[in-house]
């Protein structure tokens, strides 16, 4: 059983990297947020609106545990906040998984997010300065949790293929 867990801030490339890694390794990619949406039969936004964040974080933790306990091989892409709640960061250090923090700078994240921020409810209504400050604060707050990953891969100034290769090197 092989579990590869990718984590990092929104815009760091978790889904894109996971999809490419999945094609190469033939290990299925599971996006935690999509798994939660399927289970709840609601979008993440609807879960937050109808049930609140505490309910969402409980669902998120349960689904993460379920995916980790599954006998299937999987590449699991976490939500940006997943490691920060319910002691999920401690799960990143389990011996039976490989956890990888896709580490991006504030500028890289900003440049990736600014053009499609309408798809990101947390930043959709922010101007450029607010957005940079928001990302900086979030990264600072979350870095403790993200850094519990077994491996860190810098994504700044790296292509998708280079980042995927960095992860393949870790797995080798």
From Swiss-Prot:
HAMAP family linked = Shikimate_kinase (MF_00109)
State where it is primarily located: cytoplasm
What is the scientific name of the source organism?
Flavobacterium johnsoniae (strain ATCC 17061 / DSM 2064 / JCM 8514 / BCRC 14874 / CCUG 350202 / NBRC 14942 / NCIMB 11054 / UW101)
Gene Ontology MF annotations: ATP binding; magnesium ion binding; shikimate kinase activity
Q: In which pathway does it act?
A: Metabolic intermediate biosynthesis; chorismate biosynthesis; chorismate from D-erythrose 4-phosphate and phosphoenolpyruvate: step 5/7
Q: Does the keyword Metal-binding apply?
A: yes
Tell me how this protein assembles.
Monomer.
Instruction: Report the InterPro entries cross-referenced here.
Output: P-loop_NTPase, Shikimate/glucono_kinase, Shikimate_kinase/TSH1
Subcellular location per UniProt equals: Cytoplasm
Q: Which reaction does it catalyse?
A: shikimate + ATP = 3-phosphoshikimate + ADP + H(+)
Q: Cofactor stoichiometry and binding?
A: Binds 1 Mg(2+) ion per subunit.
Provide the binding site for substrate.
Answer: 33, 57, 80, 142
Q: Does the keyword Magnesium apply?
A: yes
Q: Which SUPFAM superfamilies match?
A: P-loop containing nucleoside triphosphate hydrolases
CDD domains documented for this protein: SK
Q: EC number(s) for this protein? A: 2.7.1.71
Q: Which UniProt keywords apply?
A: Amino-acid biosynthesis, Aromatic amino acid biosynthesis, ATP-binding, Cytoplasm, Kinase, Magnesium, Metal-binding, Nucleotide-binding, Transferase
Binding of Mg(2+) occurs at 15
Q: What class of enzyme is it?
A: transferase
| Residues bound to ATP | 11-16, 120, 158
What the record says about family reads: Belongs to the shikimate kinase family.
Q: Which domain of life is it from?
A: Bacteria
Of the GO CC terms on this record, one is: cytosol
Cofactors needed by this protein, per the record, are: Mg(2+)
Q: What is this protein called?
A: Shikimate kinase
